[in-house]
Amino acid sequence: MTNIRKTHPLLKIINSSFVDLPAPSSLSSWWNFGSLLGVCLGVQILTGLFLAMHYTSDTATAFNSVTHICRDVNYGWLLRYLHANGASMFFICLYLHVGRGLYYGSYTYSETWNIGILLLFAVMATAFMGYVLPWGQMSFWGATVITNLLSAIPYIGTDLVQWIWGGFSVDKANLTRFFAFHFLLPFIVTALVMVHLLFLHETGSNNPTGIPSDPDMIPFHPYYTIKDILGFLVMLTALATLVLFSPDLLGDPDNYIPANPSITPPHIKPEWYFLFAYAILRSIPNKLGGVLALVMSILILAIVPILHMSKQRSMMFRPLSQCLFWLLVAVLFTLTWIGGQPVEHPYIIIGQTASILYFLIILFLMPMTSVVENYLLKW
């Protein structure tokens, strides 16, 4: 008799995706982040659902409702901090996942890669709108600054901003619609994840060597399920440590002050995971130019497959490209640091230099290095 998991219409889909899926035998721990992202998404949806039961999306009561969750709701403080710090873990895993794709050449699966970029934008939009909901000072002013960037769009910019605001400033209408979209978007993200996996399973996984692994495959279960469970334990331990020992480590103290449109905080900045893009935005004096650079800092990932000049897929055997990759990582850390600093000397020039380097490495230095490495292969 055939096993039910191979014949049942629903179970056979799960079976072919997570049980009998042929996987390359050489996958390293860098391939754990896909499943970790799935866990992060699950944690965020569950904690968010329970938070939404107690939250009120009204400017008069939003801040107090978050206080009420932390003080009066059973384990409300735990839900709130799991959700806030879960977002940080989500972005850590997300950036490591993208970095793995860049390093090992996974971007050559263009459909999977492009859906991944869409996912990145969707998660960033969700996180931004979620940051506005507690209605603290940084929530209000962050929303004001970021939504105002749309006014840089020629002709329709100002009307577009007022349409998003639902008035002439960030207020009740804006908060309500941000809550609605913040609730909806994770489910759209879940649907996109399904499409992402669908395209991935059409081609099969890449592997660290970057060479076809068809002759050497192993079943996903039990080998990679055990490996993934270890990853879950490590990540959830890190998240629990962060939540229980220093829940406000990654937050902004200004967000414990209720939103006040008449008092501007000395330094308006987004959450830490957007600081690299914020630094690129600030490094260009022109408003429209800054907005374009901000969008391009993420959208540039879409042209990475076109810029792949190497005869080898992975960077595993390309030491020159490896040096450039780690330089790019250092530049991103520098941009993240600069994004949190005030706009003054020497931070301005450091930010501008790092921004130029960021685009220069991806657009010119990496393709040129690949060509040089191809030439060296002939020796």
Curated annotation (Swiss-Prot):
Binding residue positions for heme b b562: 83, 182
Protein name stated in the entry: Cytochrome b
Cofactor (UniProt): heme b
Residues where heme b b566 binds: 97, 196
Location in the cell: Mitochondrion inner membrane
Keywords: Electron transport, Heme, Iron, Membrane, Metal-binding, Mitochondrion, Mitochondrion inner membrane, Respiratory chain, Transmembrane, Transmembrane helix, Transport, Ubiquinone
Stated family: Belongs to the cytochrome b family.
Gene Ontology CC annotations of this record: mitochondrial inner membrane; respiratory chain complex III
Cofactor note: Binds 2 heme b groups non-covalently.
Signal sequence segment: none
Highest taxon in the source lineage: Eukaryota
Main location: mitochondrion
Record text on subunit structure and interactions: The cytochrome bc1 complex contains 11 subunits: 3 respiratory subunits (MT-CYB, CYC1 and UQCRFS1), 2 core proteins (UQCRC1 and UQCRC2) and 6 low-molecular weight proteins (UQCRH/QCR6, UQCRB/QCR7, UQCRQ/QCR8, UQCR10/QCR9, UQCR11/QCR10 and a cleavage product of UQCRFS1). This cytochrome bc1 complex then forms a dimer.
GO BP annotation list: mitochondrial electron transport, ubiquinol to cytochrome c
Other information: Heme 1 (or BL or b562) is low-potential and absorbs at about 562 nm, and heme 2 (or BH or b566) is high-potential and absorbs at about 566 nm.
